[in-house]
Amino acid sequence: MADIPDFVKNSVSWNPWHGCHRVSEGCRNCYMFLGDESRGVGDSDTVRRSKTQFDLPLKKDRKGSFQLKDRLVLTSMTSDFFIEEADEWRDEAWSIIRRRKDCTFVILTKRPHRIGACLPPDWGDGYPNVRLSVSVENQSAWDERIPLLCDVPALKHDVFMAPMIGPISTDALLDRYKVDCIYLGGEYCPNARPCDYEWVLGVRESCIRHGVTFHWRNCGTNFIKGGTVYTDLPIETQGSICCSADIDHIVDDVMPKSRQTTLF
């Protein structure tokens, strides 16, 4: 069985605002919308500042220490950090990120075209505690979003290839742009679109050729391997399949060991 990657231990999600709008095929079965629906929340497309979460990284315990310890912080996982409705709150969020230099903030977006206009004045070549990331689900999303992400200066550029709903040829853009890590996962939900193992291997081989770290985190609810379709796989089984395959490719430590995490 593969060793658990450095990023698969413990993390925290920070959702300073909640709510989003679907922008592409990868959003069809978004867990945020499905989760809100299961709780009877009917206005998931209304973006609201969180009353309880906004200042989470700055909250302190009775001893005056930060409640949120040095770790990886998955940012805006129930929205998009660069969504238009959050423009009036984002400067304050950047200030919080700036103050917590001991944490690493993973900022994942499907709106890379907005990143440049939403960066703080002192961004420079990037904050040392921020990893800018995009999610891509198919070839068109990859072709559109990777140049937009990598044209923005940052110390780390990552890609969450999830949910992977079709084959993606990555060589051409990896020849041109520096990507640090690709995390790949299938779609896990009722009526999930299948992920094919051949697609996974194709991305992995491209990562090896280009010196990019590759992590396969789940195979999806419906998974195809060798022409056989496996359906309705529970999330625990999906993770076991990935571990048994042992195909992660680690170029170097993606995260400090003190910031090991499970990425949603």
Where are these regions (language model features)?
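Glycine-centered flexibility motif
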Residues: 15, 19, 26, 67, ...
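Alpha-helix initiation/capping motif
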Residues: 15, 48-51, 59, 169, ...
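Compositionally biased, intrinsically disordered low-complexity regions
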Residues: 21, 28, 42-44, 188, ...
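Conserved AdoMet/S-adenosylmethionine-binding subsite of the radical SAM
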Residues: 53-217, 222-224
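C-terminal accessory extensions appended to soluble enzyme cores
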Residues: 221-222, 227-264
